[in-house]
């Protein structure tokens, strides 16, 4: 599977929309993802043997709901899918009505 397919597969069991870059639907909980960086490594014959994709996976939910279990479940799902153990940034948006969790992790492709 490609990196984006691995993200979608990891998030699918949670029953929330999961799309690249921008979600335009009406769900209260959803995931978007983007490539923060990608680079070659393990060079041989002037070509990379491996590409490392640094990803940001964004989970949005109502700010008035507890986020701890969501954070643990999503982090574990990404790690179990082969990503590095995600660092998580938690913030609120839209006048503190939306919680935005950013999971930052990498995977080799």
Where are the regions a protein language model picked out?
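Compositionally biased, intrinsically disordered low-complexity segments enriched in polar/Pro/Gly
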Residues: 1, 6, 43-49, 86, ...
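Small/polar-rich, solvent-exposed N-terminal microdomains that initiate assembly or binding
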Residues: 1-44, 70
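N-terminal short leaders/motifs
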Residues: 5-15, 50-61
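A generic structural micro-feature
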Residues: 25, 47-52, 95-99
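Glycine-rich loops and low-complexity Gly/Arg-rich segments
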Residues: 44-45, 56-60, 81-85
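Acidic-leaning, charged glycine-interspersed low-complexity segments
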Residues: 72-109
């Amino acid at each position: 599977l490609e990196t984006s397919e691995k993200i979608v597969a990891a998030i699918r069991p949670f029953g929330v929309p999961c799309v690249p870059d921008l979600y335009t639907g009406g769900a209260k909980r959803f995931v978007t993802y983007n490539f923060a960086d990608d680079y070659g490594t393990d060079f041989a014959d002037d070509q990379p043997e491996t590409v490392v994709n640094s990803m940001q996976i964004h989970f949005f939910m109502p700010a008035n709901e507890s986020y701890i279990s969501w954070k643990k479940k999503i982090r574990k799902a990404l790690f179990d899918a082969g990503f590095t153990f995600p660092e998580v940034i938690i913030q609120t948006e839209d006048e503190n009505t939306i919680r935005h969790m950013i999971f930052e992790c990498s995977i080799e492709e």
